[in-house]
Amino acid sequence: MSSPDGPSFPSGPLSGGASPSGDEGFFPFVLERRDSFLGGGPGPEEPEDLALQLQQKEKDLLLAAELGKMLLERNEELRRQLETLSAQHLEREERLQQENHELRRGLAARGAEWEARAVELEGDVEALRAQLGEQRSEQQDSGRERARALSELSEQNLRLSQQLAQASQTEQELQRELDALRGQCQAQALAGAELRTRLESLQGENQMLQSRRQDLEAQIRGLREEVEKGEGRLQTTHEELLLLRRERREHSLELERARSEAGEALSALRRLQRRVSELEEESRLQDADVSAASLQSELAHSLDDGDQGQGADAPGDTPTTRSPKTRKASSPQPSPPEEILEPPKKRTSLSPAEILEEKEVEVAKLQDEISLQQAELQSLREELQRQKELRAQEDPGEALHSALSDRDEAVNKALELSLQLNRVSLERDSLSRELLRAIRQKVALTQELEAWQDDMQVVIGQQLRSQRQKELSASASSSTPRRAAPRFSLRLGPGPAGGFLSNLFRRT
């Protein structure tokens, strides 16, 4: 891949422009070797150039090592962040499970307390009934004793005539006791009216609780709809992943084509290198007074063979036996590597970190809704506890039965709510797992895309080197006739002009 700030492509003899030696920033060694190549500079300066080149290569290697180290540190940091996020998620899940377990234990304890209280109330009712039976038996015994006393009084009327005043006093006392009993009956009637009002208030509270239950059911339905929406978003994420995989396959096919073209270019380069070595051997065997025209014809013939070998990479190049003007007029502009290897046209709109943040926000919203539902459930439990305390103070059996039925209904509702909360938590966990899988897949795709970009850069660099080699060969062929034959050399070893092609082949 290339960027707008990447290396420019200077125009050479093959593209209809000036000589490649005019681009001082792209190939600095051309200016450094111009004098030695043309035979005008002294020879001892070449070791210094080689030392500078070696230092530059060492600097490049150090920079590459530092870059690799930075990439490894960045990978390690991302891995640590992922581990911390997973640990936080596990800790939050354990805390939620522990709170749910504590709520269940509290509910079971409250149910056991209510059952124990109901058993105590039943025991109190049985004790009161026993006391009432004892009082009735005592009243019957007192009635029998009164009848016996009356019989004794009738039999002993004469004897008890002196006690008539005492009997009248006793009658007055009994009258007062009767009035007290009547007052107690009226108080019991008032208490019954109060009980009826309390029952009506409890019925109203029961209706209010039913309305709250309906509200909770509506909230649960809303949660289910949100879960369905989350599943829809997850489905869209899967579709995006499938699209990315399809694009990755297309990019891999393009990469294979580019690699095949690069292999052909390398094979052509090797053939050209062998041809240059052959020409070098021939030049060693030839006489030093060979004319410049014969040497130019041989070099043109070798370049013609190299162009025929690289026909697949540059189909628009013409034979090098033509003059520079003819090449400028006839050779078409070579297609740059950016047109051959296009970058991926579509990228994901959001990075994996942003998608993770969005999913964490959704999970936090779900947790807030669950906490609100738990708070409402706690308030309902408190209201039920208050109702239990109020009903525990009532003695009639009907109130007790109604309290037991309300208790059972409230317990059933609490169990249903706990089951629904468990289902919501399970769905949330499944969504979080799907989210983690999607993030891992996206990270893998991103790494593959980066590797593909690196491969493309390598292929583009190879194509640029091959193109630069052809331009330099053409410039060398055009500048050769103006110099004497003994000063021209294609040697790959040490010498006044042997380092140019050797450095070029060493770079490729």
Curated annotation (Swiss-Prot):
Give the record's GO CC terms: cytoplasm
Indicate, by first and last residue, each region the UniProt record lists as having compositional bias (Low complexity). Answer: 1-22, 473-489
Give one GO biological process term.
Golgi to secretory granule transport
Q: Which residues form a coiled coil?
A: 64-300, 353-458
**Compositionally biased region (Basic and acidic residues):** 135-149
- Transmembrane parts of this sequence: none
Q: Where is this region: Disordered?
A: 1-27, 132-152, 300-351, 470-491
Q: Which UniProt keywords apply?
A: Coiled coil
InterPro entries in the record, alphabetically? Answer: Spindly/BICDR_Dynein_Adapter
Record-stated family: Belongs to the BICDR family.
Q: Which PANTHER family match?
A: BICD FAMILY-LIKE CARGO ADAPTER, BICD FAMILY-LIKE CARGO ADAPTER 2-RELATED
Q: How does it assemble?
A: Interacts with RAB13.
Protein name in UniProt: BICD family-like cargo adapter 2
Q: Which organism is it from?
A: Homo sapiens (Human)
